[in-house]
Amino acid sequence: MSIWKERMQVFFQYKDLLFQLVQRDVKLKYRRSFLGYVWSVLNPLLIMLVMTVVFSTMFQRKITNYPVYLITGRTLFEFYSTSTKAAMRSILGNGTLLKKTYVPKYIFPLAKVTSSLVDCFFSLGAMLIVIAFTHAKVSWYLLLSPIILVQIYIFSLGAGFFLSAINVFFRDMQHIYQAVITAWMYATPLFYDLDSIKNTTVVFIIKAFNPLYYYVAGFRDLVYYGRFPGPRIFWGGWIIAFLALGIGLFYFKKVQDKFILYI
């Protein structure tokens, strides 16, 4: 118990630094941009528009209100992709600071994932615009959507801790992970419905082994379908999230003392 108390004291001791790092990341993303934070809303809208044009001929007849279906999945996947790729580079990117002074190393991937979450909240504005523009039916379940955001935030933290640590020792991981993310996007029902896949084995693999499926499906249940996720999706999302966080933190803590030798 005293160990956890000590760790919480250290966390609160550096909470101001965490806030500054998150604030810096959010400001730097759109620095010197004419539209600034408007891009957080405009960018997902433009991507949604392009993907709707490209995929609508294949899937729109089978999926009601395709733009809303698309942007609800894209919003979550983009958060995971952006946050974990940023977290992966966080230790190496702050190598000079780590060499000069003591700072809890976990604070860097934590800051990257958190700043991506802030950006995701801006992106939710784009989703609401699409919902309003298409006159989509919404229910009060929409108000529960932050629950799924918390789930995928925890999951992304776990992945971010793991990736940031392994990237210190294996720099090629950045390139490998980019390929993995691309394949992962197509293996997640973002722009297609699982009902459109006739191969039951493929559907089983996606549902059983794709953790992002749980968060995309849960988010769509609340926002798009207007219902609460089933027990498998809801509780599975929590289990996967904390399992990923536990593995990520365990590996990060195990190897963090060796970072200084490689950065």
Q: Residue ranges of each PLM-predicted region?
A:
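Hydrophobic transmembrane alpha-helices and immediately adjacent juxtamembrane helices
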Residues: 1-263
